[in-house]
Amino acid sequence: LVIELGANDALRGLPLTSTRANLDAMIQLGQSINAKVLLLGMQVPPNYGARYTADFANVFVEASRKYGTALVPFFLTGVADGPEAERLFQRDRIHPNELAQPIMLDNAWPSLMRLMSP
């Protein structure tokens, strides 16, 4: 089971307790049916403030530790933080476009393959 909870919770102004609860519920549901879980971490832009930005990223790290899931710390590495970020996003500057997909695949694939190995 691959879980990627994007930054929409932050964009909607939800408290981190809600984000954490949403993530916990998804992981617990997957684990309740014995699914192996890969958690794809997300970050929010720095304009949310240093503390919130760090706390948001930490939600994924903490959930991975708590439930023993595999984790890709930041699914958009090389997309959102790279020199070509502007051309890798749709006009909304929030959602990656088709050019970003191979980079995102490269970010997730090694962890996914480890989970799928016998």
Identify what each model region corresponds to.
Residues 1-118:
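Alpha-helical cap/lid subdomain in secreted, periplasmic
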